[in-house]
Structures are given as structure tokens and as C-alpha cells.
């Protein structure tokens, strides 16, 4: 029995177009990326450059209005003692949170990478990522209750007999305060809690790629555990540490909610941008402050790139 095969009509025009793009793959790739690149360039970079350009505008303190007269007064104002203290305060906190995140994240990441598998590894992944599923503001407000006077933290320390130690610690000028929720230590703990998962996961991924044969070879050659860690594990984990530090450093640097809810009085860069733009209406000064984290993060990215951070992302 004969079988009739239906053939779709040929489309010579479509064949020519596909053949043209086959012979010119670069053009096809360009057209494929043209839409996303235009969106990224116009919406993201366009709005960012517009904001930064306003940092050179003039703000009239008398009329509270912005005029498009170019000036460097806003940039020079960043180096005033009060504004300089804000930059140093923010940079110090970002560095402290990053260092503490590395210290806390490494043991957990090492255990997850070397000693867990199957359901146990899935449990640790969920445990690390679970706080990230909650609202950022909810977590910040929850910590204000935990650290408040007569809160859970103080109750716990009281039952451990450590309340006098806490009282003595809160009298220190740089980290202390009336309560944990109004102290620099409390602000540091909230930052550390919120951004710690962003350090654990990249470090764990870097340690996961560490071949067990290297550890065995190091032991066979007579290296002590401390030497193995220093000369084998740590160099291979540095890209993951650098990748995690990008998140912890930059996110702390630009945060304005935690400094507003927890800790002693004192502006951070994010608070200053919000205050200048929202409360005062001084958009040029807010834009000038926006330039500070951009420059700092760009310098930091250039530094961690040399450590292989982008290869570990």
C-alpha cells in the first residue's frame, strides 16, 4: 500500500535568512543580545549616570531648590570631618562584618563540603538559606526585639550569670550603648546574621571543589594538619572567600535600614543618602554620597578579582 508523505512547502526566504545568520554568527549573537544590552545600558547605567551627574549640581540652602549649575562643592563636602566620619564608620563596619563572616563561615562550609552528603547536606543547605527566605525588614525588626532591654538576649545572659559582663562591655565607648539594641555590638550582630549566608555558600562551593587526593598527598608527605590548611586548603579556598566578601562588604556598605533600627546614633552612608534626598531634598549631596560606595566597591572588586573571586561565583 502506497503511503503519501505530506511535505511542508519550502520557504526560500526563510532559508536565505537562516543561511545568512549561519554564515555570520557574530551578527546573530549581537542581535540576540541587543535587547538585554539596551535595557541594561539605558535603564541601569542611564539612571545611574543621571543620578551621579546631579552630584555636580548646585543646591540652594535658602530656597531649598536644585539648580543645574555645575560645581565641585558637593564632592569637596564629602571630606568635611562630619561626612568623613560617616564614610569611615561605614567602611569599618563593612570590613568588620566581612572578617567575622569569614571566621564563622569557614568551619561550617568545611563541614558541609567534607563531612555531609545526601539528606544531611540538603538539611544544611536549607538551614543556611532559610533566613534568606524571610523579609529583610522583618528580620531587622525581630532583632530589635531580641536585643532590647529585658529581651531574649538579656534574659539568656542573665540566666547564664553573664549579665555583669554584658553591662561592663556596654560601657565601652566604641561598641557599647544603653542596651544591646542601641549598641554598636548589636548593630554588628544584626549585620553578621543577615549577610552570613552570602559568605557560607561561596566558601562551601570552593571547598567542594577541593580534591581529596590533595589532602591525602599532603598527609602522605608528612605535612601536619596546620600546614595542610595553610599551604593547601586556604589557597584554594581564597577565591570562594573573596567571592563571598563581595556580597558581605558591598551589602553592608550600602545598607541603611539596620543602622536606622539598631545601634547608637550616627549616620551610615545609606542613611545619609536617604536623609539628604528624602528629608532635606538635597539631591546633589545625596548623589555625591552615592558616589562613595560606588568607588569603594569598584576598588574592592578590582582587588578581589586578583584573588580569583569572579571564577568562584
Task: Show which residues each predicted segment covers.
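C-terminal transmembrane helix and the adjacent membrane-cytosol boundary/short C-terminal tail
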Residues: 2-13, 20, 57, 204-215, ...
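N-terminal signal-anchor/first transmembrane alpha helix
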Residues: 2-53, 121-127
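Interhelical loop and adjacent transmembrane-helix boundary motif
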Residues: 9-11, 23-28, 55, 60-62, ...
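Membrane-interfacial helix termini and adjacent extracytoplasmic/periplasmic loops
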Residues: 18-22, 140-192, 226, 263-264
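Transmembrane alpha-helices
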Residues: 34-44, 130, 193, 199-213, ...
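Non-cytoplasmic
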Residues: 51-54, 60, 195-200, 240-274
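Transmembrane alpha-helix signature in integral membrane proteins
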Residues: 81-112
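Cytoplasmic-entry segments and transmembrane alpha-helices of multi-pass inner-membrane transporters
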Residues: 108-143, 215-216, 229, 238
Amino acid at each position: 500500500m502506497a503511503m503519501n508523505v505530506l511535505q511542508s512547502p519550502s520557504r526560500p526566504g526563510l532559508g536565505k535568512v537562516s543561511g545568512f545568520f549561519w554564515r555570520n554568527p557574530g551578527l546573530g549573537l549581537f542581535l540576540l543580545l541587543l535587547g538585554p544590552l539596551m535595557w541594561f545600558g539605558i535603564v541601569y547605567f542611564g539612571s545611574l549616570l543621571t543620578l551621579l551627574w546631579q552630584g555636580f549640581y548646585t543646591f540652594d540652602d535658602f530656597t531649598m531648590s536644585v539648580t543645574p549649575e555645575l560645581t565641585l562643592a558637593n564632592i569637596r563636602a564629602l571630606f568635611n570631618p562630619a561626612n568623613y566620619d560617616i564614610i569611615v564608620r561605614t567602611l569599618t563596619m563593612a570590613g568588620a562584618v566581612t572578617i567575622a563572616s569569614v571566621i564563622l563561615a569557614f568551619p561550617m562550609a568545611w563541614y558541609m563540603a567534607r563531612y555531609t552528603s545526601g539528606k544531611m547536606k540538603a538539611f544544611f543547605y536549607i538551614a543556611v538559606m532559610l533566613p534568606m527566605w524571610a523579609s529583610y525588614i522583618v528580620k531587622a525588626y525581630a532583632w530589635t526585639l531580641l536585643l532590647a532591654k529585658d529581651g531574649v538576649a538579656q534574659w539568656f545572659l542573665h540566666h547564664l550569670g553573664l549579665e555583669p559582663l554584658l553591662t561592663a562591655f556596654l560601657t565601652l565607648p566604641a561598641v557599647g550603648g544603653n542596651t544591646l539594641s542601641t549598641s554598636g555590638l548589636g548593630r554588628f550582630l544584626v549585620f553578621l546574621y543577615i549577610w552570613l549566608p552570602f559568605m557560607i555558600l561561596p566558601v562551601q562551593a570552593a571547598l567542594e571543589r577541593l580534591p581529596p587526593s590533595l589532602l591525602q598527598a599532603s598527609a602522605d608527605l608528612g605535612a601536619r594538619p596546620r600546614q595542610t590548611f595553610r599551604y593547601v586548603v586556604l589557597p584554594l579556598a581564597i577565591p570562594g572567600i573573596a567571592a563571598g566578601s563581595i556580597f558581605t562588604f558591598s551589602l553592608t556598605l550600602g545598607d541603611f535600614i539596620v543602622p536606622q533600627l539598631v545601634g547608637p546614633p550616627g549616620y551610615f552612608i545609606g542613611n545619609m543618602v536617604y536623609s539628604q534626598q528624602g528629608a532635606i531634598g538635597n539631591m546633589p549631596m545625596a548623589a555625591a554620597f552615592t558616589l562613595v560606595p560606588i568607588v569603594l566597591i569598584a576598588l574592592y572588586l578590582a582587588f578581589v578579582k586578583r584573588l580569583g573571586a569572579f571564577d568562584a561565583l
